[in-house]
């Protein structure tokens, strides 16, 4: 299949991560997957949710949103509608679940870390970019409060799919919109699965195709883990 940006089927978009993008946040990163750009801010609070107050542990959570002009046409802010959409809630729960797999919460007793992921420009893969960039922001925040030992694993995510019967890595919006199936895969740096979200949009896909998609994602995630490590080391 001919990809509009001339990428090979197994090639990531150009990916960059700028750490410490926001001087106010304990940890932050601006992540770019091609034309998808997301700001991830990690804020540390010396408190835990009420339901955790009797437990010797900490908490990591996430919020997600898209700026009004992050897409082709302006969207109304969800705050003006009075509630978040089901899509937004689903995505921020996914991000939170994924990032909690990066840390040992028992080493964060008394702390809550909130990762805010704000999409400033969207071209597919905003949730996977949020997880990958959010991990760097979380790591930088833990360095700031000298809790780096709480990190268990780096976590990253990528999308894969089938378009015109061909497997593709890191779908942009056009590819995602026309995919027969698309799958979001979250792994840790040991290449263990954390979460898989997959849908046969136009047709069902086989177990063999699913395995091939996971293998394709794994190869892309290896590159993302390498990038995360470089950014954390040199940032």
Regions of interest found by a model, annotated:
Residues 16-18, 30-32, 39-41, 61, ...:
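Structured core elements
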Residues 29-108, 193, 197-215:
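Glycine-rich, flexible beta-strand/loop modules in the N-terminal catalytic cores of phosphate-handling
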Residues 7-11, 21-24, 30-33, 52-55, ...:
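Solvent-exposed alpha-helices and their adjacent loops that cap or buttress functional pockets
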Residues 1-7, 75, 79-80, 151, ...:
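Compositionally biased, non-globular sequence tracts
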Residues 15-17, 24-27, 45-48, 100-102, ...:
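Glycine-rich, charged/polar anion/phosphate-binding loops
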Residues 114-144:
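Conserved mixed alpha/beta catalytic, RNA-binding, or beta-rich assembly cores of soluble enzyme
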Residues 1-57, 222, 226:
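N-terminal, positively charged regions that mediate nucleic acid binding
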Residues 107, 125-129, 139-141, 148-235:
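A structural signal for small-residue-enriched, beta-sheet-centric alpha/beta enzyme cores
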